[in-house]
Amino acid sequence: MSQKMARVWIQEEEFTLVDGLKKLCANDWKEDNGTFKHGYLMKLEQHMNVCHPNCGLQALPHIFSKIRGWKKHFMTISLAKSRSGLGFRYIDGTILVDDPEAWDDFIKVDLYAKSMTFKKWPLFADWEEIFRKDGATEQSAERT
């Protein structure tokens, strides 16, 4: 039984994927419930191959897996932002922990959060634009 290696994305490819997702949002490929219309992965694969002709990224599994991971991170950070004692600093992409006890309680609720503790999330503002159901950004809740 062989194990496949996960594909490592370079930063330029991630930026291109974000750009492609934003273009889909702007061109009515996003449904009111926050999901994308059928065929969006193929559109993104085409976009990636135009911008990075030799990248070899395919809709399945590469693009789908990347977006699924981003959505998990987005949901966890969004939930953390809504909790007292926690927040997000957009300027450097870090999760703020004003109250360590609040963080300990949070990682009991969202087990995925524990692996996100000391990482930076520079694409979070883009994810808000892409994954938020109403498409609005939440600049008023920004903490610095």
Model-derived features: where do they sit?
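Sequence-specific DNA-binding modules of eukaryotic transcription factors
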Residues: M1-T144
